[in-house]
Amino acid sequence: GTYDEYMFVCTDIDTANDSIHPEFQGSIDSGSNYNVAMTTTYFIAGHYEDDSSTIFGYNTGLDQAQGTVDQQFSYNQGSGADESGSGIIHLFAPASTTYVKHFYSRFISNGADEIARDNFCAGYFNTTSAIDAIRFKIDSGNITAGTFQLFGIS
């Protein structure tokens, strides 16, 4: 890889369905398979739109312990005009063939349940093979709008 750090900037991601979860996963075979084992942690800070409550906590249902499924980086995103999401994912040394590949993300979204969420995810791809492709998707339906940008950081 050209850079030791890559930053994915996701802006105004909107979806066709309510209550979806944007996800990502890496590949070590140029995108033929997206199933690299990863260990992750996930927590959320949130505030209800009607000011009735707040939330903050570790979400055990969104972390992985050597899981090979796609990792969520936003939770329960809605499809309404005021329910898009934006955020950043950092990936470190994906071309390394010596070390595991660390990442972290922060994603802001408004949910179908009218909760503004600040989503934090961190972890690592447990492989010493180079990560040579990243896939972004949602768990149901289609992404209908938004911009995904990739920046290399020296």
What are these regions (language model features)?
Residues G1-S154:
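Surface-exposed molecular-recognition determinants
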